[in-house]
Amino acid sequence: MTTLDPSDIRILEAVQDDGRLTNQALADQVGMSTSPSWRKVRKLEEDGVIQGYRATLGRKAIGLGVLAFVRIKIDSHSEAEAEQFAAELMSLDEVITCYSIAGDADFLLQVVSHDLDTYADFAMSTLRRLPRIKEMQTTFVLKETKSFTGFPLKHARSVKTGA
Protein backbone atom coordinates (compact mmCIF):
# COMPACT_ATOMS: atom_id res chain seq x y z
CA MET A 1 0.00 0.00 0.00
CA THR A 2 1.23 3.47 -0.84
CA THR A 3 -0.18 6.85 0.06
CA LEU A 4 -0.48 9.46 -2.67
CA ASP A 5 1.58 12.49 -1.73
CA PRO A 6 1.23 16.02 -3.18
CA SER A 7 3.84 15.36 -5.89
CA ASP A 8 1.98 12.18 -6.93
CA ILE A 9 -1.20 14.24 -7.26
CA ARG A 10 0.57 16.88 -9.38
CA ILE A 11 1.90 14.10 -11.64
CA LEU A 12 -1.57 12.54 -11.94
CA GLU A 13 -3.15 15.89 -12.78
CA ALA A 14 -0.52 16.53 -15.45
CA VAL A 15 -0.64 13.12 -17.17
CA GLN A 16 -4.43 13.00 -16.95
CA ASP A 17 -4.50 16.34 -18.77
CA ASP A 18 -1.84 15.34 -21.33
CA GLY A 19 -0.65 11.74 -21.47
CA ARG A 20 1.87 12.63 -24.18
CA LEU A 21 4.09 14.76 -21.95
CA THR A 22 7.75 13.83 -22.12
CA ASN A 23 9.37 13.01 -18.81
CA GLN A 24 11.30 16.30 -19.02
CA ALA A 25 8.13 18.33 -19.64
CA LEU A 26 6.32 16.47 -16.86
CA ALA A 27 9.17 17.04 -14.42
CA ASP A 28 9.26 20.75 -15.29
CA GLN A 29 5.48 21.06 -14.90
CA VAL A 30 5.37 19.39 -11.49
CA GLY A 31 8.54 21.03 -10.17
CA MET A 32 10.79 17.98 -9.94
CA SER A 33 13.95 16.76 -11.61
CA THR A 34 13.58 14.07 -14.27
CA SER A 35 14.82 11.01 -12.34
CA PRO A 36 12.46 11.31 -9.35
CA SER A 37 9.61 12.20 -11.71
CA TRP A 38 10.27 9.10 -13.82
CA ARG A 39 10.50 6.87 -10.72
CA LYS A 40 7.22 8.24 -9.36
CA VAL A 41 5.43 7.67 -12.68
CA ARG A 42 6.73 4.07 -12.81
CA LYS A 43 5.59 3.48 -9.22
CA LEU A 44 2.14 4.91 -9.98
CA GLU A 45 1.93 2.58 -12.99
CA GLU A 46 3.07 -0.46 -10.97
CA ASP A 47 0.53 0.32 -8.24
CA GLY A 48 -2.29 0.50 -10.80
CA VAL A 49 -2.97 4.19 -10.20
CA ILE A 50 -1.97 4.97 -13.79
CA GLN A 51 -3.57 2.21 -15.85
CA GLY A 52 -2.64 3.27 -19.36
CA TYR A 53 -2.30 6.07 -21.86
CA ARG A 54 -4.68 6.62 -24.76
CA ALA A 55 -5.98 9.25 -27.12
CA THR A 56 -9.50 10.60 -26.56
CA LEU A 57 -11.42 10.30 -29.82
CA GLY A 58 -14.36 12.43 -30.89
CA ARG A 59 -17.27 9.97 -30.93
CA LYS A 60 -19.20 11.77 -33.66
CA ALA A 61 -16.03 12.48 -35.66
CA ILE A 62 -15.49 8.73 -36.05
CA GLY A 63 -19.08 8.09 -37.13
CA LEU A 64 -20.68 7.04 -33.85
CA GLY A 65 -23.69 9.36 -33.74
CA VAL A 66 -25.74 7.40 -31.21
CA LEU A 67 -24.90 7.11 -27.52
CA ALA A 68 -27.27 5.09 -25.36
CA PHE A 69 -27.52 3.69 -21.87
CA VAL A 70 -29.05 0.22 -21.59
CA ARG A 71 -30.39 -1.16 -18.33
CA ILE A 72 -30.56 -4.94 -18.21
CA LYS A 73 -32.22 -7.28 -15.75
CA ILE A 74 -31.14 -10.89 -15.87
CA ASP A 75 -33.25 -13.85 -14.79
CA SER A 76 -30.57 -15.51 -12.67
CA HIS A 77 -28.50 -13.90 -9.98
CA SER A 78 -25.96 -16.57 -9.18
CA GLU A 79 -22.45 -15.17 -9.09
CA ALA A 80 -21.17 -17.54 -11.78
CA GLU A 81 -24.00 -16.75 -14.21
CA ALA A 82 -23.70 -12.99 -13.63
CA GLU A 83 -19.94 -13.19 -14.28
CA GLN A 84 -20.53 -15.22 -17.45
CA PHE A 85 -23.11 -12.69 -18.64
CA ALA A 86 -20.72 -9.80 -17.94
CA ALA A 87 -17.98 -11.59 -19.89
CA GLU A 88 -20.32 -11.93 -22.87
CA LEU A 89 -21.09 -8.20 -22.70
CA MET A 90 -17.40 -7.32 -22.57
CA SER A 91 -16.84 -9.06 -25.89
CA LEU A 92 -19.23 -6.68 -27.69
CA ASP A 93 -17.42 -3.73 -29.32
CA GLU A 94 -20.52 -1.51 -29.18
CA VAL A 95 -20.59 -1.79 -25.37
CA ILE A 96 -18.01 0.76 -24.26
CA THR A 97 -18.68 0.53 -20.51
CA CYS A 98 -20.49 -2.03 -18.41
CA TYR A 99 -21.43 -1.76 -14.75
CA SER A 100 -22.98 -4.28 -12.39
CA ILE A 101 -25.43 -2.12 -10.42
CA ALA A 102 -27.76 -2.19 -7.44
CA GLY A 103 -31.40 -1.25 -7.78
CA ASP A 104 -34.09 -2.29 -10.21
CA ALA A 105 -31.63 -3.50 -12.88
CA ASP A 106 -28.55 -5.70 -12.77
CA PHE A 107 -26.34 -4.10 -15.42
CA LEU A 108 -25.95 -0.64 -16.93
CA LEU A 109 -24.29 -0.48 -20.32
CA GLN A 110 -23.02 2.49 -22.29
CA VAL A 111 -23.42 1.68 -25.97
CA VAL A 112 -22.36 3.51 -29.13
CA SER A 113 -23.65 3.06 -32.64
CA HIS A 114 -23.48 4.72 -36.05
CA ASP A 115 -27.19 5.59 -36.14
CA LEU A 116 -30.57 4.48 -34.76
CA ASP A 117 -31.03 1.77 -37.38
CA THR A 118 -27.63 0.29 -36.57
CA TYR A 119 -28.44 0.46 -32.85
CA ALA A 120 -31.79 -1.27 -33.44
CA ASP A 121 -30.05 -4.07 -35.34
CA PHE A 122 -27.48 -4.47 -32.55
CA ALA A 123 -30.12 -4.40 -29.81
CA MET A 124 -32.42 -6.90 -31.48
CA SER A 125 -29.96 -9.28 -33.09
CA THR A 126 -27.14 -9.23 -30.54
CA LEU A 127 -28.13 -7.91 -27.11
CA ARG A 128 -31.63 -9.41 -26.93
CA ARG A 129 -30.27 -12.79 -27.98
CA LEU A 130 -27.90 -13.05 -25.05
CA PRO A 131 -29.05 -15.74 -22.62
CA ARG A 132 -30.59 -14.78 -19.27
CA ILE A 133 -31.93 -11.34 -20.28
CA LYS A 134 -35.23 -10.82 -18.51
CA GLU A 135 -35.71 -7.14 -19.35
CA MET A 136 -33.88 -4.49 -21.34
CA GLN A 137 -34.50 -0.74 -21.42
CA THR A 138 -32.65 1.77 -23.60
CA THR A 139 -32.26 5.49 -22.91
CA PHE A 140 -30.84 7.57 -25.75
CA VAL A 141 -28.60 10.56 -25.15
CA LEU A 142 -30.05 13.62 -26.90
CA LYS A 143 -27.13 15.92 -26.17
CA GLU A 144 -23.84 15.23 -24.44
CA THR A 145 -23.39 18.24 -22.16
CA LYS A 146 -20.29 16.98 -20.35
CA SER A 147 -18.17 14.04 -21.33
CA PHE A 148 -15.52 12.32 -19.27
CA THR A 149 -12.29 14.31 -19.16
CA GLY A 150 -10.65 12.73 -16.13
CA PHE A 151 -11.18 11.97 -12.49
CA PRO A 152 -11.32 14.75 -9.89
CA LEU A 153 -8.20 14.55 -7.75
CA LYS A 154 -8.94 17.08 -5.01
CA HIS A 155 -9.87 14.29 -2.57
CA ALA A 156 -7.10 11.88 -3.57
CA ARG A 157 -4.43 13.34 -1.32
CA SER A 158 -4.86 10.84 1.50
CA VAL A 159 -6.01 7.83 -0.50
CA LYS A 160 -4.09 4.63 0.00
CA THR A 161 -3.50 2.53 -3.09
CA GLY A 162 -2.37 -1.03 -3.52
CA ALA A 163 -1.12 -3.24 -6.31
Identify the role of each PLM range.
Residues 1-163:
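A compositional/biophysical signature of low hydrophobicity enriched in polar/charged and small residues
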